[in-house]
């Protein structure tokens, strides 16, 4: 007799035997014979592309369950796979109805939202569980009860991103999203500015065009160093290549990717760039069981035909594949718990639901399992995944490393900060070239003196260069020293903008500043400082007078050479102007013989030499006994006297300081002593920390000192100090010229004896001199000569000629007598000019 057969002999058939056989056929046989449970999968494919990774994971999970009989010992899991085109919701609905007609316990897929909604509607009507593994935004009035989604809740991921931003203390964040769903996934972060001190700038990647270089260029120009990318792993791989091309793969940037497949990307090109790259990971690779399953997956994938370039590591299991693997296992666990799960054929047009559908759906939502993506539990109300863990990973030189964990209940827990990474910090600078900014300041940084031309770092020497050289030898980095362009240390203006070396560091034009830069609270807000190599405080530094005796020309020291030259030129200029105006104005001509009012001879005291004598006498504060009479000449004299008053006063004050400097004792013992006096001028280095200290100080003594320093210019007494007096002098001379012209016109109109001829009547025949000669009683000679006033020098020459002619005629006619003879003494002729 073969094993497993039942022999019933004739005559032994009784009623009890019949009931026993019926019980065996109805209860014992179904439990011992294998059952078949069919599930359906709808996957989207693209023409001429390999099989979807979700479909491969679907088959891999079914095969793994059938091989391991511990989960479903008496059930064989089979599947039906249907492939559709992308975004074809009608084809998705038709394929779903075909699978339901075959009799499936659950439907998996598709991925995209339009097709998912169509399949979900059918499953909800026929009460068949719908298993989803992609992110899907639930509607407000969600009435879909027959589905679960293994993808983490978008609200939880958004909170995780916000917690990470707060942990890093980012004040400005740039969010770059691929499509509109990214704004929904990050809504917690977008609403953060209303609750936290965070500024968010939102940008969108170009749709359809993978060239993001223009966008990256704007971000680089705008100094956007903290960037969050919400995109797929395919887009992330392409963006990383363009970031490297744009020169933005440096330690100054921090990129965060919301994709859960950052660990699966090939990041070999960026490991040693120093860039900060962070992301999430859902796979629990720390579990040995998970690691073994991932290793089996990798072995199968490496044996498969090569896939096109996707930016992923070879044979790696993505999050999509892991979620599909866990989804199949969740259905298998629920079916194992269900006793007598009978799957019937369903017709979409009949709208007759599956009788065991609600019970099976509840079993799936109640299932608990630690899968590839960690602990899996569902919310019974909306079917979303809850209470999951997200690993925080960061790119290091060794690859991606776990630096923390985020849980939907406990929040963020960073573990990287507690690790001793001193060795990594030391090694991170090896074989790197740093741009070092500095400033010329003896003895810290100086130009090296050499007969040969020097280039690069050899141009400089000093304490800071020696310190930098020692650090380079210890840490193994290279450096390129550059002087700060504006020659300043770094201070903040009223607009909050920085200059000097601080600005070079903020703008990342330099990696390091090695200089005698003071550590202040304001500077520490924007840049980081190392341990100080020297501890100093604010000190009063003043020059001790040297012991040299005054030289022969020490009296010239109070004024700069430019001032001395301008004073001499001003003296010459004023003298010439005074001479011309005195000749031009009629009020400077006077009668030398006041006893003879009928005399037509007039004289002028302001010859060229007398004008120079007047200017020199006023400059020496002595006078010259020459007093101007006309208003124009008095204006010239008054302006010149005012000019000499300022010059001589300034000279006297500075001369006393120069001569007594050796006898001065130190009157400054504290800041209060310095603030109380005004004789000794003082200041600080422009845009340095000392200047900023006095500028921002609220202490009355320091405020008074800052007011004094800001009102003084750190220069000698030169043109910029007393140059205004030269402007006053020039304005006075111009005014005197106009006044002289007015005086001449006024006198011309008033004198009715002057003949006016033509248009030149104001300037011609100003003087009309009459000389009458009387002979004897019977003879008389009258000579009348009119002088033309074409030019002043011509007039003076004619006057001298007439004088000689009169003398000659008086010798030829002895009987002649003069009624009026105008003669000038020879000595007066030399000093004064006479017009007859």
Curated annotation (Swiss-Prot):
SUPFAM superfamilies attached to this UniProt entry: Periplasmic binding protein-like I (SSF53822), Periplasmic binding protein-like II (SSF53850)
GO CC, any one term: postsynaptic membrane
Keywords in alphabetical order: Cell membrane, Glycoprotein, Ion channel, Ion transport, Ligand-gated ion channel, Membrane, Postsynaptic cell membrane, Receptor, Signal, Synapse, Transmembrane, Transmembrane helix, Transport
Tissue/organ expression: Most abundant in the cerebellum. Also present in the suprachiasmatic nuclei of the hypothalamus.
Residues given in the record as L-glutamate binding sites: 516, 518, 523, 689-690
Signal sequence, start to end: 1-30
Protein family according to the UniProt entry: Belongs to the glutamate-gated ion channel (TC 1.A.10.1) family. GRIK1 subfamily.
Further comment found in the protein's record: The postsynaptic actions of Glu are mediated by a variety of receptors that are named according to their selective agonists. This receptor binds domoate > kainate > L-glutamate = quisqualate > CNQX = DNQX > AMPA > dihydrokainate > NMDA.
UniProt name for this protein: Glutamate receptor ionotropic, kainate 1
């Amino acid at each position: 007799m073969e094993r497993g057969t039942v022999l019933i002999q004739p005559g032994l058939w009784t009623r009890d035997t019949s009931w026993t056989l019926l019980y065996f056929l109805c209860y014992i046989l179904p439990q011992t014979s294998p059952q078949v449970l069919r599930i359906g999968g709808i996957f989207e494919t693209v023409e001429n592309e390999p099989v979807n990774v979700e479909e491969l994971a679907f088959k891999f999970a079914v095969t793994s369950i059938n091989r391991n009989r511990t989960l479903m010992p008496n059930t064989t899991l089979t599947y039906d796979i249907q492939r559709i085109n992308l975004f074809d919701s009608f084809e998705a609905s038709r394929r779903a109805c075909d699978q339901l007609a075959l009799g499936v316990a659950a439907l998996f897929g598709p991925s995209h939202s339009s097709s998912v909604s169509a399949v979900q509607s059918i499953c909800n009507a026929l009460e068949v569980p719908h298993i989803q593994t992609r992110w899907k935004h639930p509607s407000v009035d969600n009435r879909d009860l027959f589905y679960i989604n293994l993808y983490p809740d978008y609200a939880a991921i958004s909170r995780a991103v916000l917690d990470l931003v707060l942990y890093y203390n980012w004040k400005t964040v740039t969010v770059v999203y691929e499509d509109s769903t990214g704004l929904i996934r990050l809504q917690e972060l977008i609403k953060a500015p209303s609750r936290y001190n965070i500024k968010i700038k939102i940008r969108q990647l170009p749709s359809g065009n993978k060239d993001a270089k223009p966008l990256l260029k704007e971000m680089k120009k705008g100094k956007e160093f903290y960037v969050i990318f919400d995109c797929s792993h395919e887009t992330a791989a392409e963006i990383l290549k363009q970031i490297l091309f744009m020169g933005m793969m440096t330690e100054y940037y921090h990129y965060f990717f919301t994709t859960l497949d950052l660990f699966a990307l090939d990041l070999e090109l960026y490991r040693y760039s120093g860039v900060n790259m962070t992301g999430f990971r859902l796979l629990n690779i720390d579990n040995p069981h998970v690691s073994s399953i991932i290793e089996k997956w990798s072995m199968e994938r490496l044996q498969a035909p090569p896939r096109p370039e996707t930016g992923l590591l070879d044979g790696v299991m993505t999050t999509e594949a892991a979620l599909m693997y866990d989804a199949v296992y969740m259905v298998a666990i629920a079916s194992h718990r269900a006793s007598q799960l009978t799957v019937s054929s369903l017709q979409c047009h009949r709208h007759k639901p599956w009788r065991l559908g609600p019970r099976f759906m509840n079993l799936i939502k109640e299932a608990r399992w630690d899968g590839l993506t960690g602990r899996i539990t569902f919310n019974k109300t909306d079917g979303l995944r809850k209470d999951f863990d997200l690993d925080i990973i960061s790119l290091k030189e060794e690859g991606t490393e776990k630096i923390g964990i985020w849980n939907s209940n406990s929040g963020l827990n960073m573990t990287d900060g507690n690790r001793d990474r001193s060795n990594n910090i030391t090694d991170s600078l090896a074989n790197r070239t740093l741009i070092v900014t500095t400033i010329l300041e003896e003895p810290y940084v100086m130009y090296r003196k050499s007969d040969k031309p020097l280039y690069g770092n050899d141009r400089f020497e000093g304490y800071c260069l020696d310190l930098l050289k020692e650090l380079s030898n210890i840490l193994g980095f290279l450096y390129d020293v550059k002087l700060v362009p504006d020659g300043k240390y770094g201070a903040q203006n009223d607009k909050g903008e920085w200059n000097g070396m601080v600005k070079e560091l903020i703008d990342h034009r330099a990696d390091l500043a090695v200089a005698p830069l003071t550590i202040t609270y304001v500077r520490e807000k924007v840049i980081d400082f190392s341990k100080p190599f020297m501890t100093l405080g604010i000190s009063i530094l003043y020059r001790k007078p040297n012991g040299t005796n005054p030289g022969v020309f020490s009296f010239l020291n109070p004024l700069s050479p430019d001032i001395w030259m301008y004073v001499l030129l001003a003296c010459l200029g004023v003298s010439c102007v005074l001479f011309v105006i005195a000749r031009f104005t009629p009020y400077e001509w006077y009668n030398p013989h006041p006893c003879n009012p009928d005399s037509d001879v007039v004289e002028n005291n302001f010859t060229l030499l007398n004008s120079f004598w007047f200017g020199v006498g006023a400059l020496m504060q002595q006078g010259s006994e020459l007093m101007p009479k006309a208003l124009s000449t008095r204006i010239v004299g008054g302006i010149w006297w005012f000019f000499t008053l300022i010059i001589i006063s300034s000279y006297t004050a500075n001369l006393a300081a120069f001569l007594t400097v050796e006898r001065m004792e130190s009157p400054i013992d504290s800041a209060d002593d310095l603030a109380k006096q005004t004789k000794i001028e003082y200041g600080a280095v422009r845009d340095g920390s000392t200047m900023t200290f006095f500028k921002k100080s609220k202490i009355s003594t320091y405020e008074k000192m800052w007011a004094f320093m800001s009102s003084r210019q750190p220069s000698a007494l030169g043109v910029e100090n007393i140059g205004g007096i030269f402007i006053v002098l020039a304005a006075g001379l111009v005014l005197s010229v106009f006044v002289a012209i007015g005086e001449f016109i006024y006198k011309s109109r008033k004198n009715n004896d002057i003949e006016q001829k033509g248009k030149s009547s104001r300037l011609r025949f100003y003087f009309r001199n009459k000389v009458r000669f009387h002979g004897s009683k019977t003879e008389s000679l009258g000579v009348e000569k009119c002088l033309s006033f074409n030019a002043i020098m011509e007039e003076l020459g004619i006057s001298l000629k007439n004088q000689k002619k009169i003398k000659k005629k008086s010798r030829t006619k002895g009987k002649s007598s003069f009624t009026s003879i105008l003669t000038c003494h020879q000595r007066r002729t030399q000093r004064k000019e006479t017009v007859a």
